[in-house]
Regions:
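Conserved mixed alpha/beta catalytic, RNA-binding, or beta-rich assembly cores of soluble enzyme
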Residues: 1, 7-110
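C-terminal functional extensions of proteins
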Residues: 61-170
Length: 170
C-alpha cells in the first residue's frame, strides 16, 4: 500500500537488514534482531528499480550474491535472501553510499557528498545517544570498526575526486 500511495521512482537501502532463509533478521554477529527490525525488504521485492548497499551479507540486496557470501568465512552465516536491481557491496556501507553520491555528483555536476565535519558530528552524536559500532558492538566513535580519521580520509578522497571531475567538466 505504501508504494501505491507514495509512488517512489526508486528504492535505496543502506545497511538495512534483510531476512535470511529462515525468515529471521540478523546483525553481523548473527544475533537475531527480528523483533527490532522493520521488515522493509518486502518492498524491494515488489519494486522494479532498487539499489541495495551493504557490507556484511545480511543487508537488503545481498541475495544477489548469496552463494558467494556462503562461500566466505568472514561474512555472516545466514546471508540475506532479498535481491535488488543494483547492488553496491562495499567494505563499509557508508563508504558505498558515499560512492553512490560521488557518482551522482559527477552526473549532475554538483557535489552532493556530505561535509567531513558534518559526518564526524553525526557519528559522535549518535554514539552519545546510544548507538554502537556495528563491528565491535561497543559505544565508540567508529563505523564498522573504522575510526573517524579513516572515515574522514575516505570521504575526503571522494570529495577530491568529485571536485576534480567537476573542474575538468567546466
Amino acid at each position: 500500500k505504501i508504494l501505491e500511495t507514495e509512488r517512489p521512482n526508486i528504492l535505496i537501502s543502506i545497511e538495512r537488514c534483510s531476512a535470511s532463509f529462515d525468515n529471521k533478521y540478523r546483525n553481523m554477529r548473527n544475533d537475531d534482531i527480528s523483533p527490532f527490525t522493520a521488515k522493509i525488504d518486502y518492498l524491494f521485492s515488489i519494486h522494479d528499480k532498487t539499489i541495495g548497499i551493504g557490507d556484511g551479507g545480511n543487508e537488503i540486496g545481498m541475495g544477489n550474491i548469496k552463494t558467494h557470501i556462503e562461500e566466505t568465512k568472514i561474512l555472516v552465516d545466514y546471508p540475506a535472501i532479498s535481491k535488488v536491481t543494483n547492488l553496491i557491496a562495499s567494505s563499509v556501507s557508508n563508504w558505498g553510499a558515499y560512492g553512490l553520491l560521488a557518482a551522482l555528483s559527477i552526473k549532475i555536476n554538483q557535489n552532493l557528498l556530505p561535509l567531513v565535519k558534518y559526518q564526524k558530528e553525526v557519528i559522535e552524536k549518535t554514539v552519545q545517544l546510544g548507538a554502537v559500532d556495528g563491528f565491535s558492538g561497543l559505544k565508540e566513535n567508529k563505523v564498522d570498526g573504522k575510526d573517524l580519521k579513516e572515515n574522514s580520509h575516505i570521504l575526503n578522497q571522494l570529495h577530491e575526486l568529485v571536485n576534480n571531475q567537476l573542474k575538468s567538466s567546466n
